Regions:
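Repeated loop/turn-to-beta-strand initiation elements of outer-membrane beta-barrel proteins
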Residues: 72-79, 115-121, 149-155, 183-188, ...
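Outer-membrane beta-barrel "beta-signal"
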Residues: 225, 257-271
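Transmembrane beta-strands of outer-membrane beta-barrel pores
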Residues: 44-50, 81-89, 112-114, 125-129, ...
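Residues that define the transmembrane beta-barrel architecture of outer-membrane proteins
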Residues: 36, 57-61, 100-104, 117, ...
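Membrane-embedded beta-strand positions of outer-membrane beta-barrel proteins
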Residues: 40-42, 65, 79-81, 108, ...
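Detector for outer-membrane/organellar transmembrane beta-barrel domains
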Residues: 137-218, 222-225
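Outer-membrane beta-barrel translocator domains and adjoining extracellular loop/strand segments
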Residues: 28, 52-56, 89-99, 131-138, ...
């Protein structure tokens, strides 16, 4: 206002300018406080690893989109769609290359914080477009994370409720991670995780293993850089190996494979 007056603008014009500025500010504040959010990510990995299994030995790119709704004190809802595409489908001894969609997953979830604890529950629908019989899987999951300055432990359990095995097809994961802020925009995150499957879970993926066992252990290092408030880029490297001897012998990870170094880069847009 002082600048406007010094420039000789009339009081009426100044008031109009102030009103317009206030309206614009209110719109910006309203936009910033909008309960809706959208995030789009694209990951590029050297291979597609899932719970210690090599789902693709070829490089993949994995786009995803998440719509979030902040419910304030009542928590938050989100809906996510994720997909994995092979960058190449070249087979040994064949010059043919093609790009193919391996998988499309749909997730709905609810999350709420209770003090230092973050609790999330959701449903995942796994679909495989290129599978002739149209096979799909569905899981319910629950995860609990404890936020603290030292290290953040997270425990998660997944239940394939459509499986016909009476024993229940469950997979669990325990993880530890910590964010180190190297500077205002750069974060380094080391992590370790350990997966466990019930005997029914193992029977669904490999033969001759009928027991509950620790399966996959992964040690990772991730680096994330916030380019702007809405754009970030990152990179990660991981080492995964199969813990249980019987699962190794049964080729749980893949044929004649019991360990893998893998990683990639990613970009994320938030609105």
């Amino acid at each position: 206002m002082n600048t406007l007056i010094r420039m000789g603008i009339s009081a009426a014009a100044a008031a109009m300018a102030a009103g317009a500025l206030a309206a614009e500010t209110n719109e910006l504040e309203e936009a910033e406080s909008s309960p809706l959010s959208v995030e789009v990510t694209v990951d590029f990995f050297s291979s597609y690893m899932w719970r210690g299994q090599i789902c693709s030995d070829a490089p993949v790119w994995q786009p995803a989109a998440t719509l979030g709704l902040d419910l304030g004190d009542f928590g938050a809802l989100s809906a996510n769609v994720w997909s994995s595409f092979k960058l190449t489908n070249r087979r040994e001894g064949s010059p043919v290359r093609n790009m193919g969609n391996q998988e499309i997953d749909y997730t709905v979830s609810y999350a709420k914080s209770f003090g230092d604890f973050d609790i999330e529950a959701g449903h995942i629908w796994y679909t495989f477009p290129n599978v002739d019989d149209g096979e799909s899987n569905e899981e319910l999951y629950l995860s609990v994370a404890y936020n603290n300055p030292i290290v953040t432990p997270t425990a998660a359990v997944y239940w394939d409720y459509r499986d016909n095995d009476d024993d229940g097809l469950f997979y669990g994961n325990l993880a530890l991670a910590h964010d180190f802020e190297l500077c205002d925009s750069l974060t380094l995150t080391p992590s370790v995780s350990l997966g466990m499957g019930t005997d029914a879970y193992l029977r669904a993926y490999v033969d001759d293993v009928n027991k509950t066992a620790f399966l996959d252990q992964t040690t990772g290092l991730a680096l994330a850089y916030a380019v702007t408030d809405w754009l970030s880029v990152g990179a990660q490297v991981n080492y995964t190996w199969i813990v249980d001897r019987d699962a190794r012998r049964a080729d749980y990870m893949g044929r004649d494979k019991n360990q893998r170094v893998w990683g990639g880069v990613n970009v994320a847009f938030s609105f």
